[in-house]
Every structure is written in C-alpha cells, then in structure tokens.
C-alpha cells in the first residue's frame, strides 16, 4: 500500500512545486513592469511642473518689461511737457495760430461800434438772441456790432470772445484786417491830435506893474 501511495504523493509535490515556481515567475515578471510604469509617470509630472514654472517665469518677465517700458515712456512724456512749458519760445507756431490764440487788442476792441438794442432796431446782422450765451436780447441792452458782417452780440459776451479769438462767432469772418485798420486809423488820429497840440503857440503879453499904472493916471 505504501508503494502505491508514493508515486501519487510525489506527483502532487511536483505539481505544487511547479505551480509555485510558475506563480513566482509571473510575479517576478509583473513587478518590473509595475516599477517601470511608476518610474514613467514620475518624469511626466516633473515635466509638467517644469513647463508651468517656465511659463510663469516668461509671463512675469513680460509683465516686468512692459511696466518698465511704460514708466520710461511716461517719464519722457512728462519731461518733454515740462520742457515745452518752461521754454515756450521753442514751440513752432504759425502766424495764424498765434493770432487766433492771442485775440484782438483792447484798444481795437473799444473802437468797435456799440448800439442799444430795441425791438424796432433795423440792423440786418442783429437777430433776437446772442449766439454766444443763447439768451434773448432785452430792450436797452448794449450790443457790440462787428464790422463787415454786422452781427451783434452782448457786450460782455463778445468782448470775452474776442480776447481769445479773431473771428466772428457766428459766421467765422476774420477780423484781423479790420482790427489792424482800426488801430492804424486810431494811431493816425492820435498822431494828428498830438501834432496839432504841439503846433499851437499861445503868446501872453506881460502885464504892467500896478504902481506904474497908478502914477500914469495921477500925472494925467
């Protein structure tokens, strides 16, 4: 009986040993693959974090460069503006711009005609309202009438306008030639008046002393 059970037991032992060795080989074959898979995932994460860090660094450098460029441009603009304000002679300007910004002189402004408004006034360029302040004319108000175009405006409105402009606010007629003519006529009139004053020669004869007059009367 012992001899009959021996082959079966040895075969079982052989089978178990074969199965164990097969399983162990399978496990040994699978473990390196798992280890390699874990090692393969680690470089991917490292590469991702490196790319994100590089992108953030590039973005930060771009922001710093843009801020620096903006600061430089602003400093240059402020410096050029301060230079223009401190040295207005160096600013190129045309005669037309200078005349527009300067306005007319007060002496020529006072020579422009002034009328008292009334509803019955018969002037073609005078309407019913002032185009500067957009208020209606009231009877008795003083209006200044511009030459050539004959447009009328409130005295205070047009005087303030003409201190900064050389044109009519309604038709944009230029008043440069007119004002120059007014000033030249005014200067000529002043010169004539001064010449007439200088040419007047007043001679007053001296009076005789009272004592001589009394003596002459007594003797006569």
From Swiss-Prot:
Pathway(s) per entry: Protein modification; protein ubiquitination
EC number: 2.3.2.27
Keywords assigned: Membrane, Metal-binding, Transferase, Transmembrane, Transmembrane helix, Ubl conjugation pathway, Zinc, Zinc-finger
Domain of life: Eukaryota
Disulfide pairings: none
GO biological process: protein ubiquitination
Gene3D superfamilies in alphabetical order: Zinc/RING finger domain, C3HC4 (zinc finger)
Catalytic reactions of this protein: S-ubiquitinyl-[E2 ubiquitin-conjugating enzyme]-L-cysteine + [acceptor protein]-L-lysine = [E2 ubiquitin-conjugating enzyme]-L-cysteine + N(6)-ubiquitinyl-[acceptor protein]-L-lysine
Zinc finger regions, RING-type: 130-172
Location, primary (coarse class): membrane
Annotated TM spans: 53-73
PANTHER family the UniProt entry points to: RING-H2 FINGER PROTEIN ATL77, RING-H2 FINGER PROTEIN ATL78
Protein name: RING-H2 finger protein ATL77
Gene: ATL77
């Amino acid at each position: 009986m012992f001899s009959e059970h021996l082959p079966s037991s040895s075969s079982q032992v052989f089978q178990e040993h074969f199965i164990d060795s097969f399983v162990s080989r399978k496990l040994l074959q699978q473990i390196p693959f798992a280890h390699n898979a874990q090692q393969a995932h680690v470089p991917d994460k490292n590469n991702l974090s490196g790319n994100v860090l590089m992108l953030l660094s590039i973005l930060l450098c771009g922001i710093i460069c843009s801020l620096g460029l903006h600061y430089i441009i602003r400093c240059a603009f402020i410096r050029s503006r301060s230079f223009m304000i401190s040295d207005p002679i160096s600013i190129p300007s045309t005669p037309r711009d200078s005349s527009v910004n300067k306005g007319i002189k007060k002496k020529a402004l006072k020579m422009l005609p002034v009328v008292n408004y009334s509803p019955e006034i018969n002037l073609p360029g005078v309407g019913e309202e002032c185009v500067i302040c957009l208020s209606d004319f009231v009877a008795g108000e003083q209006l200044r009438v511009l030459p050539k175009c004959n447009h009328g405006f409130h005295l205070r409105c047009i005087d303030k306008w003409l201190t900064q402009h050389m044109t009519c606010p309604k038709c944009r007629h230029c008043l440069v030639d007119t004002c120059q003519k007014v000033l030249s006529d005014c200067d000529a009139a002043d010169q004539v008046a001064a010449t007439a004053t200088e040419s007047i020669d007043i001679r007053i004869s001296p009076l005789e002393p009272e004592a001589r007059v009394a003596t002459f009367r007594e003797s006569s």
